[in-house]
Design a protein with these regions (language model features):
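Acidic, low-complexity intrinsically disordered segments
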Residues: 2-191
Length: 191
């Protein structure tokens, strides 16, 4: 496996055709703030891109953000998210017909032909942060599914909905506490 550091990726001035305005969208992540948004946000911002993110599980689609984006990438970590995205993608394409549309996450390669039929230009699976960053820089990711060993950056959660809008635990005394989770692997044995 190849080891790749975020610092090894192309920096701001290297690619004149870069897609500078990036919109990442998640449709569903089991009531969690999506790591699949926070980690690529860190990579893309480090490379100098203007990144917005929307979690449609807890907020509405911002059509102005869609119109403003050069690259719109939809995160597909599971089947439910993919089904929800299938209704979203035509709306995104209609709102911004010139944007490059990507789908990334474990279920993107599994549904590649279906997603391409909906108008998706690029499909990324496996370790997708490098591919998204290359795509935003105006390049072409080397493969659909990357198995590269990445050196993850601290996730950038700025601009994402507050944690109190996600899953919580109701304690026996009625107190509501924010619930967290740890993602030790990407995906499960079924993907």
């Amino acid at each position: 496996m190849v080891s790749l550091l975020a610092a090894d990726l192309p920096q701001t001035d290297a690619h004149p055709k870069r897609l500078q305005r990036v919109l990442l969208i998640s449709t569903y992540e089991l009531g969690h703030q999506p790591f699949g948004l926070a980690e690529p946000i860190a990579w893309l911002r480090r490379a100098g891109h203007d990144v917005r993110a929307l979690d449609l599980a807890v907020e509405q689609l911002d059509e102005q953000a869609v119109r403003d984006a050069d690259l719109v990438a939809v995160y597909l970590p599971m089947h439910t998210a993919t089904r929800l995205a299938a209704r979203l993608i035509p709306r995104v394409r209609q709102t911004n017909p010139t944007a490059h549309l990507a789908a990334y996450g474990l279920y993107a390669p599994l549904q590649a032909s279906y997603l391409r039929g909906l108008g998706v230009n690029t499909i990324l699976g496996g370790e997708f942060e490098e591919g998204l960053t290359m795509l935003a820089a105006g390049g072409r990711p080397p493969s659909t599914v990357s198995l590269a060993r990445l050196a993850f950056l601290p996730p950038d959660r700025s601009g994402l909905p507050a944690l109190d809008r996600y899953g919580h635990v109701r304690m026996p005394d009625g107190e509501r506490r924010i619930a967290g989770y740890v993602e030790a692997t990407r995906g499960c044995k079924h993907t």
